[in-house]
Amino acid sequence: MSAIVDIIGREILDSRGNPTVECDVLLESGAMGRASVPSGASTGSREAIELRDGDKGRYLGKGVLRAVENLNTEISEALMGLDAQEQTFVDRTLIELDGTDSKERLGANAMLAASMAVARAAADESGLSLYRYFGGSGPMSMPVPMMNVINGGAHANNTLDLQELMILPVGAASFREALRWGAEVFHMLKKLIHDQGMSTAVGDEGGFAPNVASHEAAIQLILKAITEAGYEPGTQIALGLDCASSEFYRDGKYTLAGEGGVSLSSQEFANLLATWCDKYPIISIEDGMAENDWDGWKLLTDQLGKKVQLVGDDLFVTNTRILREGIQKGVANSILIKINQIGTLTETFAAIEMAKRAGYTAVVSHRSGETEDSTIADIAVATNAMQIKTGSLSRSDRMAKYNQLLRIEEELAEVASYPGLEAFYNLR
């Protein structure tokens, strides 16, 4: 038995300089696991609740001392003596201890830190890499990275409404090659932006935030960077969008400041997205409709769902109950997986499994506020999710995940496969 003998919670800072929760779990054998949790900027209204102190005199109210206190008292007492190898039981204990649907009492940030640290301690004791501890000894696929190279919306202070414009190296032969392609396009894009007299400062997730004239101008800039880096748009490197539409959906309309302030109905916005998909090699759209616009989501899915990956982030918030409803209604064809949206590893894995059984893809994702913790890289490989979204090709908090994936691919050697377009099995 891998008995838990000590749990230590602490307040640390994330990549935006805001407090977050870190947890150490020590086992009787001397094995130790450490984990820290991320935090989002644009959040779905049904996400599990991260506990913040609200004391404006300290970190502008964003301190997490209450969550840390919960870790060091209630959570510690409840998990002490439990077998760290029994992840499902550990997570069920956390869920029952909290007693709320949204994890608002103990805080999803406190609960997730404990859940992840327990898993890391158990892997350490087993002498296994974390991805092998999660996924067993079977064959595993490396994920196709969705690389956020131009930021807008809540992630930037520019004219773009859409939150992320991404490149996807679908034609690469390996993850290592995909990462190289992405880095080369990133640096070419930086040169093009600089040559046009725009800022090359990067945002929270490492992407650029230039003041371009329109969304299509941003897309065309990326396509030029792909071409000038020596790659073929579409066949080698495809495009993806994260609209984060809930951020500009008001009173039943999608108001696009970056498109001259036009206000569009759900059908009109779906038509606009469809037009872009016809003109450009866009194969993935995240949150193409607002989280509460289920009729709009159905319109979009019926219109594009057979040829474009439609990812529900704010829509599903990594929650199996909401995902099940979406599957039943034929809404979207993919789910974004953010571990802090749901608050435990067990629930995270359940969402991935439910999606795959329904023929939906699962995209494992970071948050805009990250740490050096690279657990999501191991999760993406262990679950054969085949897609990961973990930022651009700058900022060490993003590189931590990419570099971990390089190590995993090296360790797997010839057993590692890179799926490319096969990762998009939801497209028919």
From Swiss-Prot:
Reactions listed under catalytic activity: (2R)-2-phosphoglycerate = phosphoenolpyruvate + H2O
InterPro entries named among the record's database cross-references: Enolase, Enolase-like_C_sf, Enolase-like_N, Enolase_C, Enolase_CS, Enolase_N
Keyword Magnesium among record annotations: yes
GO biological process, one term: glycolytic process
Pfam (any one): Enolase_C
Primary enzyme class: lyase
Pathway it works in: Carbohydrate degradation; glycolysis; pyruvate from D-glyceraldehyde 3-phosphate: step 4/5
Active site: E205 (proton donor), K338 (proton acceptor)
Statement: the UniProt record of this protein carries the keyword Magnesium: yes
Entry note: cofactor: Binds a second Mg(2+) ion via substrate during catalysis.
List of residues binding Mg(2+): D242, E286, D313
Record GO terms (molecular function): magnesium ion binding; phosphopyruvate hydratase activity
Residues binding (2R)-2-phosphoglycerate: Q163, K338, R367, S368, K389
SUPFAM superfamilies: Enolase C-terminal domain-like (SSF51604), Enolase N-terminal domain-like (SSF54826)
Keywords associated with the record: Cytoplasm, Glycolysis, Lyase, Magnesium, Metal-binding, Secreted
Any one Gene Ontology cellular component term annotated for this protein: cell surface
Subcellular location: Cytoplasm; Secreted; Cell surface
Names of required cofactors: Mg(2+)
EC id: 4.2.1.11
HAMAP family from the UniProt entry: Enolase (MF_00318)
Function: Catalyzes the reversible conversion of 2-phosphoglycerate (2-PG) into phosphoenolpyruvate (PEP). It is essential for the degradation of carbohydrates via glycolysis.
Family: Belongs to the enolase family.
UniProt protein name: Enolase
Species this protein is from: Bordetella pertussis (strain Tohama I / ATCC BAA-589 / NCTC 13251)
